[in-house]
């Protein structure tokens, strides 16, 4: 057998001398080794692979398996971004009382993963908040009202950028809506609404 490639079974690591079964990852198996973990029947398409254990499941048993783990998955909760359930013992990123899979939450600018320590969040312009890593935060435009980044629609007033909800009267704190009249206090360089003029 020298000089020849010996095919080994991915599961039992023994040489394959008869029928070869190849899965989607090009791994090779004995026919009797490539079976469903639950019912032990030979695997055929479609089949499912458990990412944690590497075990294979036929389509019928995958349905059973999901039904069995549903209460556990619901008790663990789901990611606020992709809405997929968390797995048991999975690392979870918690930010502002919302929970995410590690890797789901990314910087809006550079697309690198956001960690739990150094991030900035823009809450004003969209239902789904924009997040920014510390490095990119130094480069983006900031709202003059809240000093948060302005990645969505902004209001240009007094030569500065504002979130629409951040441009407020200095005296009464009412939001000054776009195209509404306002005056500027020359001493403090702050806006006042028409009511407080």
Swiss-Prot record:
Gene Ontology biological-process entries: cortical actin cytoskeleton organization; filopodium assembly; phagocytosis; positive regulation of phagocytosis; response to imidacloprid
InterPro entries: Znf_LIM
Sequence ranges assigned to domain LIM zinc-binding in this UniProt record: 7-68, 77-139, 141-197
Pfam families in the record: LIM
Domain of life: Eukaryota
Residues making up the signal peptide according to the UniProt record: none
One cellular component (GO) term of this entry: phagocytic cup
Alphabetical list of SMART domains matching this protein: LIM
Gene3D superfamilies: Cysteine Rich Protein (2.10.110.10)
Alphabetical keyword list: LIM domain, Metal-binding, Phagocytosis, Repeat, Zinc
An example Gene Ontology molecular-function term: zinc ion binding
Alphabetical list of PANTHER family matching this protein: LIM ZINC FINGER DOMAIN CONTAINING PROTEIN, ZYXIN/TRIP6
Subunit structure, as described in the record: Interacts with ChLim and rab21.
Task of the protein: Involved in the regulation of phagocytosis. May repress ChLim and activate rab21.
Protein name: LIM domain-containing protein F
């Amino acid at each position: 057998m020298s000089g020849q490639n010996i095919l080994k079974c991915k599961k039992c690591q023994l040489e394959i001398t008869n029928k070869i079964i190849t899965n989607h990852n090009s791994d090779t198996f004995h026919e009797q080794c490539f079976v469903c973990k639950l019912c032990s029947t030979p695997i055929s398409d479609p089949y499912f692979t458990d990412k944690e254990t590497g075990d294979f499941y036929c389509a019928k048993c995958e349905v059973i398996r999901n039904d069995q783990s549903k209460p556990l998955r619901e008790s663990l909760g789901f990611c606020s971004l992709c809405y997929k359930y968390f797995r048991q013992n999975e690392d979870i990123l918690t930010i502002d009382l919302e929970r995410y899979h590690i890797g789901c939450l990314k910087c809006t600018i550079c697309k690198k993963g956001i960690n739990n320590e150094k991030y900035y969040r823009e809450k004003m312009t969209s239902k789904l908040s924009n997040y920014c890593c510390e490095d990119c935060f130094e480069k983006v435009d900031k709202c003059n009202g809240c000093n948060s980044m302005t990645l969505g629609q902004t209001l240009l007033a007094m030569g500065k950028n504002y979130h629409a909800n951040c441009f407020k009267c200095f005296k009464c704190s009412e939001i000054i809506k776009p195209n509404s009249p306002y005056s500027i206090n020359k001493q403090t360089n702050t806006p006042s609404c028409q009511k407080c003029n």
